[in-house]
């Protein structure tokens, strides 16, 4: 079987996927080591028996709903190729909105940034890449996530980031930052979307929070003040229906300049506030 015929068959088998053609192409690129342009130009290239078996196994797993990123171990975020694993969330395009808003608020001078619950390191590494003059600290409570974020930093040769194991602020006593960012768990445990799509395979501890999904958001907002320098910013990603509640917690905790920004789909996604003692 050649590239072209396998793609045709795979697209048909993945017809219930949101993106059957792209899914099939990614799997073929991953197994053959060939880029999309090569595959399109040389569709008559035969697959080896080993490649056909690998593709059959991956195709079956994808048909059962396993995310492409977990099948290949790779995901692009902010144009950075990242290693991913089932120990962490898969970086999503909407989270790039958090990076955009953070960059827009960073001062021109060198500053210190903290990323809470870093997972793959996506947010921290994007900020560190864009602002090599800044010192970025990234923390996660899960050892596997810390190891993965370190691997990504080393692979990308990003030097201005340090990655630590910490449950939110627990290992950061006495330290201060000019900006704190986070994409914490914010989904309610009873949300029916937890049984749909990619999230079925992602770690629930990185998705679900108590108090209707607000517990971790509230904890960060209430405790970030003591870690921020005067005038420093806190930016949080949250659910599309949580904007009003998150703004209320920011204001209750004494932050100024509180505002919510929308994601690429037009939904309220990132809320920020400024620490003004």
Swiss-Prot record:
- Write out the residues that bind S-adenosyl-L-methionine: 117-121, 140, 168, 183
Q: Which InterPro entries match?
A: DNA_methylase_N6_adenine_CS, HemK-like, Methyltranfer_dom, N5-glutamine_MTase, PrmC_N, RF_methyltr_PrmC, SAM-dependent_MTases_sf
EC number(s) per UniProt?
Answer: 2.1.1.297
Give the reactions, separated by semicolons, that this protein catalyses: L-glutaminyl-[peptide chain release factor] + S-adenosyl-L-methionine = N(5)-methyl-L-glutaminyl-[peptide chain release factor] + S-adenosyl-L-homocysteine + H(+)
One GO molecular-function annotation for this sequence?
nucleic acid binding
Determine if Transport is one of this entry's keywords: no
What keywords are annotated for this sequence in UniProt?
A: Methyltransferase, S-adenosyl-L-methionine, Transferase
Q: For this chain's UniProt record, which GO biological process terms are given?
A: methylation; translational termination
Q: Does the keyword Transferase apply?
A: yes
Pfam families in alphabetical order: Methyltransf_31 (PF13847), PrmC_N (PF17827)
Specify the domain of life of the species encoding this protein.
Bacteria
Q: Where are the bilayer-spanning segments? A: none
Annotated substrate binding sites: 183-186
Sorted alphabetically, which PANTHER family does this protein's record hold?
Answer: HEMK METHYLTRANSFERASE, MTRF1L RELEASE FACTOR GLUTAMINE METHYLTRANSFERASE
What the protein does comes down to:
Methylates the class 1 translation termination release factors RF1/PrfA and RF2/PrfB on the glutamine residue of the universally conserved GGQ motif.
Q: Which family does it belong to?
A: Belongs to the protein N5-glutamine methyltransferase family. PrmC subfamily.
Q: What protein name does the entry list?
A: Release factor glutamine methyltransferase
Tell me which species this is from: Salmonella typhimurium (strain LT2 / SGSC1412 / ATCC 700720)
Designated gene of the protein: prmC
């Amino acid at each position: 079987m050649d590239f072209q015929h396998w793609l045709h068959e795979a697209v048909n088998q993945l017809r219930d996927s949101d993106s059957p053609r792209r899914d099939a192409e990614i799997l073929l690129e991953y197994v053959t080591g060939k880029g999309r342009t090569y595959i399109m130009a040389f569709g008559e290239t035969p697959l080896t028996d080993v490649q056909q078996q690998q593709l059959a196994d991956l195709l079956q797993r994808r048909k059962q709903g396993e995310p492409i990123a977990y099948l290949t171990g790779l995901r692009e975020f902010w144009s950075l190729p990242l290693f991913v694993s089932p120990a962490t969330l898969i970086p999503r395009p909407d989270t790039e909105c958090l990076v955009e808003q953070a960059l827009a608020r960073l001062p021109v001078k060198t500053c210190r940034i903290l990323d809470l619950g870093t997972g793959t390191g996506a947010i921290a590494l994007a900020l560190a890449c864009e602002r090599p003059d800044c010192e970025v600290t990234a923390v996660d409570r899960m050892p596997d996530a810390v190891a993965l974020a370190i691997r990504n930093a080393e692979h990308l040769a990003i030097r201005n980031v340090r990655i630590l194991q910490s449950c939110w602020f627990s290992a950061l006593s006495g330290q201060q930052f000019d900006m704190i960012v986070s994409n914490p768990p914010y989904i309610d445990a009873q949300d029916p979307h937890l049984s749909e799509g990619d999230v079925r395979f992602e770690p629930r501890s990185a998705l679900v929070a108590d108090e209707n999904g607000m517990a971790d958001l509230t904890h960060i907002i209430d405790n970030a003040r003591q870690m921020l320098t005067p005038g420093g910013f806190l930016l949080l990603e949250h659910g599309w229906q949580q904007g009003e509640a998150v703004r209320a917690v920011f204001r209750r905790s004494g932050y100024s300049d509180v505002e919510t920004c929308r994601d690429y789909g037009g939904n309220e996604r990132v809320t920020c506030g400024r620490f003004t003692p």
